[in-house]
């Protein structure tokens, strides 16, 4: 029978939740890296035992961790497998993320725009998102703050920036969102290794069609009333983008305000918020087998980062947007004031698609029936930053 492995990154460690295909009884492993912020964990689709993790600390900085046995043991790439993953400073070059500032690469950028419009030095702070290759377990991409895209081709031992992204002519005008200037979304297109999508808060969405050498903004149709030019080429605070692998080029976006859709690889977007009670939010995802079935969690506002009316409701559209239904069975509908962050929802690929999300007060909820009913598979974790799912044979 198939198994499901849920990877939860939290403010104070990582947790791994495992169940069989029925998804009723869960085993919990963790906390791994107790006390550390674990921004993101994700497994390789080629080798499910290979899991990459972003570990960060205000004291010791950024550390990349890797497991080659499904999360049982961890090591920093470049150190021997089985070496203690103890707290402390980075122990290998795998944790060096150095911006490329050479003019020869097309990215001689040293500053970007700050909140007040002044220029601010580009500084590496942390890895927000890790995206393993669809074809090679040793290739992995990292989206970082301050916003840039890095790639490793040796299992996370060495990292090199793809400088064409920051080298795009708009780079000096990028500025942070409320959570920092982070590259938080990376989507690799199945069957087309040259195409990739990324999203930056608050610069917008970008696409490459040549493997990362050059990039174009894909923000046509977005409207952001909080920037000087609401329809500008860049400057939009994109919170997350999702794509069903069976339909590359059809993208769904949760923006700072507005839920959006593109049917042409991001060249043009249209609003699909429809009857949502509020179209502010962070997460968005797509059913594994129904590419027109989309999930969001509306949040009351950009100043009140909790669910609308104190009710935790996932909204589902079976029509690709505009028509939304509230999914409440098993979710608290009174005095609930939680948030669901941008990387904290995922789906499995079992025949009956499972949906998973984590909250800022430490619950991880699961639905084994496409969202019709929900159960907390774990409670009282630290605030959940990210949720990823592996479907195991």
List each model region and its residues.
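Extracellular glycan-interacting surfaces
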Residues: 1-393
């Amino acid at each position: 029978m198939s198994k499901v492995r849920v990877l939860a990154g939290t403010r104070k460690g990582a947790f791994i939740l495992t169940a069989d295909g029925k998804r009723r009884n869960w085993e919990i492993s963790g906390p791994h890296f107790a006390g550390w912020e674990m921004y993101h964990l994700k497994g390789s689709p080629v080798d499910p035992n290979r899991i990459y993790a972003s570990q960060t600390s205000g004291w010791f900085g950024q550390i990349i961790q890797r497991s080659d046995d499904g999360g049982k043991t961890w090591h920093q790439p470049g150190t021997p497998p089985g070496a203690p993953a103890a707290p402390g400073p980075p122990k290998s070059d795998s944790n060096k993320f150095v911006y490329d500032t050479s003019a020869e690469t097309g990215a001689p950028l040293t500053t970007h725009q700050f909140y007040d419009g002044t220029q601010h030095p580009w500084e590496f702070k942390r890895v927000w998102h890790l995206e393993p290759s669809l074809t090679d377990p040793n290739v992995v991409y990292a989206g970082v703050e301050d916003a840039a895209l890095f790639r490793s081709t040796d299992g996370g031992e060495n990292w090199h920036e793809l400088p064409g992204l920051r080298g795009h002519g708009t780079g000096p005008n990028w500025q942070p969102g409320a959570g920092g200037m982070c590259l938080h979304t990376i989507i690799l297109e199945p069957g087309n290794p040259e195409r990739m999508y990324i999203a930056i808060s608050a610069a917008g969405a970008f696409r490459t069609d040549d493997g990362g050498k050059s990039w174009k903004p894909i923000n046509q149709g977005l409207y952001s009333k909080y920037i000087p030019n609401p329809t500008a080429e860049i400057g939009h605070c994109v919170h997350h983008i999702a794509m069903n692998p069976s339909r590359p080029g059809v993208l769904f976006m949760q923006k700072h305000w507005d839920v959006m859709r593109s049917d042409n690889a991001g060249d043009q977007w249209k609003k699909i918020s429809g009857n949502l009670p509020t179209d502010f939010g962070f997460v968005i995802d797509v059913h594994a087998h129904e590419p027109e079935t989309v999930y969001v969690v509306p949040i009351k506002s950009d100043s009140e980062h909790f669910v609308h009316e104190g009710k935790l409701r996932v909204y589902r559209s079976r029509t690709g947007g505009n028509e939304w239904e509230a999914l409440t069975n098993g979710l608290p509908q009174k005095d609930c004031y939680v948030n669901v962050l941008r990387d904290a929802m995922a789906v499995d690929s079992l025949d009956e698609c499972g949906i998973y999300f984590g909250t800022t007060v430490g619950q991880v909820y699961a639905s084994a029936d496409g969202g019709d009913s929900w159960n907390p598979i774990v409670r009282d974790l630290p605030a959940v930053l990210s949720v990823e799912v592996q479907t195991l044979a």
